[in-house]
Amino acid sequence: MNTRDLEAFLAVVETGSIVGASVRLHLTQPGVSRRIQSLEERLGVALLDRQSKPLKPTAAGRETYAQGRRMLRVLDDLKTGLSPKGVVSGEFRLGISPYLSEVGITTLADRLRGSFPDLLLRITTGWPEQLLEQLRRSEIDVAAFCLPDGMHPSTEIEADALDIQPLFVVASQSLDLPSPATLQDLSPFPWIFNQDGCGFRSSIQRRFEQEHLPLRIGIEALSSDLRLSLVARGLGITVATRAAIESSPLRAALQIVPVQDFEPRVRAWIVRRPPVGRLVRPIACLTSALEAVIDEQAPGSNQRDSS
């Protein structure tokens, strides 16, 4: 089997189009099409549903994708092992949650590119369940995300637990809230969260369910800066890390609300499917860089008065 034909097929599946694959592989569109046709002729099956937009693999195509991705990974491992200096090359596909991406994507990318200049880094964002599913389908090599403290990733994958991060309830200074407040006091207010699937949001939802209290979702906003801006305007309350609160340009308009018997926390995880082969060192580098990013978000790293 021609590995270049296989690479073209994988690129079409991952980009969803001949155009996207041609850009990724630096080939003409007819060149990509010829490679796909060559692979289909060799295997004797149709690999793509050409009526779908974006292009999607057939049942045979999905199996070919999974097997082909593993095959190319083995070849990359072999190349790395035979390299005179052990140079790590090939793709490193990282899936990362929006929060970790927001606070540390540049640090992670810089560290990986500096340590492994021949490694082609591909990064996607998603919520934990999405990333775990992509990991199961071999669409990514490793995932980094946060889960509420006490929750663990699936047992069929390898997972490294990183530091726990405390979260703080944040409201506008204009809101007259008792200090400390109770969850009952907070229940009437709308909450400003990420979309469903966020570890922060899951942590709050679980506790409100335990107390049999309604949780009102007022606004869904992806950026922590935007959420804090909306909170400062009195449009709702949210949770955030200490570092995000203290670094906000609207800090003077925000108050951290102590809440009785409520200390929401999330833990960061690095997860992957064994074996990792040539990616052992890049994953170790990623883990070290992410630990440094999380340390910077710790309460003591940039702490001011909490009111």
Annotate each PLM feature.
Residues 10-28:
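Short helix-boundary/capping micro-motifs
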Residues 42-43, 64-86:
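Alpha-helical linker/hinge and terminal dimerization helices associated
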